Amino acid sequence: MLKDGSMLEISRPCGKDAAEILSYLKIIGGETHFLMMDSNGLGISEEKEAAILEDSLKEERGGMHIGRINGEIACMFSLVCSHRRKTAHTGEIALSVQEKFWHIGVGSAIMETLIKLAEDACVENIELGVYADNVRAIALYERYGFEAAGRHRRKFYADGIYYDQLIMDKYIEVDQNKLREIRKACPR
């Protein structure tokens, strides 16, 4: 349950969610400069998005997720795990929350879910990239144990301004026997 008493229903999106997700991405893209898109969204077709979503469902470790409040997409997040032996212990997270759902605990709920997904996937090193001027997001990540690991200078460009990207990561304990099995199944 969130701070306002509403429930966040988390699920894996599929192809039939494509149109709604593309609309969501246009909304959030117009709400802040902290995302990789603007109010034009991703600029891909509904069919292409549906294929991406269906491919994501095949992902056994991590994958894409949406969170709904009263049936409406409030957030989207993902954990992308490495499929290589040398980096099978790593995964990258990304998340977004629609502005009208800010300040009610959605970000915290997402972070708790992502950390649990990482544990289940035997991801020891969870990584993320964030605009260096996104102080609220950085504070959220720090509350969940993420630390600054590096910086990409002038990584993003929007409205005539360059922005740095802060790289953050968190290390967690995982089942080493399970991780060895995952590594064995990975291509070189």
Regions found by a protein language model. Name each.
Residues 6-8, 70-76, 163:
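Glycine-rich phosphate/pyrophosphate-binding loop shared by adenosine-nucleotide-utilizing enzymes
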Residues 1-4, 161-188:
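Terminal substrate-recognition subdomain of acyl/acetyltransferases
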Residues 29, 41-98, 111-112, 117, ...:
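Acetyl-CoA-dependent GNAT
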Residues 127-131, 142, 147-163:
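Conserved catalytic-core motifs of GNAT/GCN5-like acyltransferases
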Residues 8-23:
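A short beta-loop-alpha structural element at the N-terminal edge
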Residues 111, 118-129:
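Conserved GNAT acetyl-CoA-binding A-motif
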Residues 107, 111, 133-137, 154-159:
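Short glycine/proline-centered loop/turn elements that form peptide/ligand docking sites
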Residues 95-100, 104, 132-133:
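Active-site acidic-Proline motif in GNAT/NAT acetyltransferases
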